Amino acid sequence: MSKPHSEAGTAFIQTQQLHAAMADTFLEHMCRLDIDSPPITARNTGIICTIGPASRSVETLKEMIKSGMNVARLNFSHGTHEYHAETIKNVRTATESFASDPILYRPVAVALDTKGPEIRTGLIKGSGTAEVELKKGATLKITLDNAYMEKCDENILWLDYKNICKVVEVGSKIYVDDGLISLQVKQKGADFLLTEVENGGSLGSKKGVNLPGAAVDLPAVSEKDIQDLKFGVEQDVDMVFASFIRKASDVHEVRKVLGEKGKNIKIISKIENHEGVRRFDEILEASDGIMVARGDLGIEIPAEKVFLAQKMMIGRCNRAGKPVICATQMLESMIKKPRPTRAEGSGVANAVLDGADCIMLSGETAKGDYPLEAVRMQHLIAREAEAAMFHRKLFEELVRASSHSTDLMEAMAMGSVEASYKCLAAALIVLTESGRSAHQVARYRPRAPIIAVTRNPQTARQAHLYRGIFPVLCKDPVQEAWAEDVDLRVNFAMNVGKARGFFKKGDVVIVLTGWRPGSGFTNTMRVVPVP
């Protein structure tokens, strides 16, 4: 599938793990991996950073963008609308500070993460800060009686979910505070449960509750979510990470709230419980993408099965050509330490090898002591892992999995990626209005970066969701002659690629363009040497 280096002339060749990428078998591929081989020049995986107290200043955000942040995530489980509006303003100020040089400008997307249908405990002894100690083996009564809403203690605990007695059985487990405290149901009443404390500990007020295996019937979109989503539409966010999605109708509900004004906002469904995993296919069809939210998922399903769910979801998203994000505890120890554990390094690399389009940081950048180091570490790990992909096998399988179609763009995308392997192209340049052409090319996972040139700022920002797309925003005025306008944008991409070190004079690039103006007409492929 690859030509020997001697035949390739003096062109810059993406030699990174090339020997391994083009092996015949998986075992051979593993044997050929070489620690002295350089990493991929351009990182293909998107990096999503949660913005919080540790990272919301304009100065820190500028450094995070330089370090590799592509998407800024705002967690609406915390903070007021005023707080988030200020954060969004800071993200945009930091992004636009690079706008003076169109070659080096990096569009950064803003993502709104909804609170979703959570279950929470009441107040401990009427105070938000009070705590009680739950002893292992003790009996704890769970009640729905509102008289105890602010009077919880070590003997009785109020929950805000009225149907809990209908959805749990005797023997069911109830987890509180991210699984730190576990209870087992011993007896059921009409409006109470008697439980035994299996894992004790210190319990504070208003803690999250998980009911693994239970079919929780809370509304997919709460009143708070509706207000938050409307706020997101006003603020022109690029994507919504919808929490606790359990079925396709939940996604439709989010879409309905976003309305006509928010119709271009991408909806990424977070899979966080057993029902979401079970009904994954219908959720995938209704969504623009998926997030593997390993935090709650690791409580809702056994911890040892999380990797299975991750691989299954990433595989199905890759097959469907939809973006997938791997999230939670990616570099958790970097909240307090400047270097990750070896397991975390492997975890991030394996998410990339599995096929994740984006990797996410949560507390590491929101409240950690080393937000910039965490971004840089993900950047370095992702580049190494991308070089180590078994590209030959992956491409063959993606082609086999794609159905026969009269969609011209599908054939163009497949052909251009195959050509990029054959001629060891340094990059693929795609001119795109809606982003669809670039998304289709990304689906076939080329080794080389896809430089997507667009004049639409939102298309550029949302393209970060897809593996391999390096979006660039062309601000030059549209030329009257179509051919001249095409040349202008291709030359702009060439200049960006050279400035970024993706290729140099004499290298080969694949150029995908349309034969006439407008969206949906990409049908011309050229193999071009870099001037």
UniProtKB/Swiss-Prot annotation:
Q: Which cofactor does it need?
A: Mg(2+); K(+)
Which positions bind Mg(2+)? 272, 296
| Further comment found in the protein's record | There are 4 isozymes of pyruvate kinase in mammals (L, R, M1, M2) encoded by 2 different genes: PKLR and PKM. The L and R isozymes are generated from the PKLR by differential splicing of RNA; the M1 and M2 forms are produced from the PKM gene by differential splicing. L type is major isozyme in the liver, R is found in red cells, M1 is the main form in muscle, heart and brain, and M2 is found in early fetal tissues as well as in most cancer cells.
The entry assigns this protein to a family as follows: Belongs to the pyruvate kinase family.
Which residue positions does N-acetylserine occur at?
A: 2
Question: Could you tell me which residues carry Phosphothreonine?
Answer: 41, 195
Q: Which organism is it from?
A: Pongo abelii
Q: Which UniProt keywords apply?
A: Acetylation, Allosteric enzyme, ATP-binding, Cytoplasm, Glycolysis, Isopeptide bond, Kinase, Magnesium, Metal-binding, Methylation, Nucleotide-binding, Phosphoprotein, Potassium, Pyruvate, Transferase, Translation regulation, Ubl conjugation
PROSITE patterns documented for this protein: PYRUVATE_KINASE
Q: In its UniProt record, which GO terms are filed under biological process? A: positive regulation of cytoplasmic translation; positive regulation of sprouting angiogenesis
Report what the protein is called.
Pyruvate kinase PKM
The record describes the protein's role as: Catalyzes the final rate-limiting step of glycolysis by mediating the transfer of a phosphoryl group from phosphoenolpyruvate (PEP) to ADP, generating ATP. The ratio between the highly active tetrameric form and nearly inactive dimeric form determines whether glucose carbons are channeled to biosynthetic processes or used for glycolytic ATP production. The transition between the 2 forms contributes to the control of glycolysis and is important for tumor cell proliferation and survival.
A Pfam family that this protein carries is PK
Instruction: Give the reactions, separated by semicolons, that this protein catalyses.
Output: pyruvate + ATP = phosphoenolpyruvate + ADP + H(+)
Q: Which residues bind L-serine?
A: 70, 106, 464
Matching entries from CDD domains are given as: Pyruvate_Kinase (cd00288)
How does its activity get regulated?
Has high pyruvate kinase activity by itself and does not require allosteric activation by D-fructose 1,6-bisphosphate (FBP) for activity.
Name of encoding gene: PKM
- Region feature (Interaction with POU5F1): 307-531
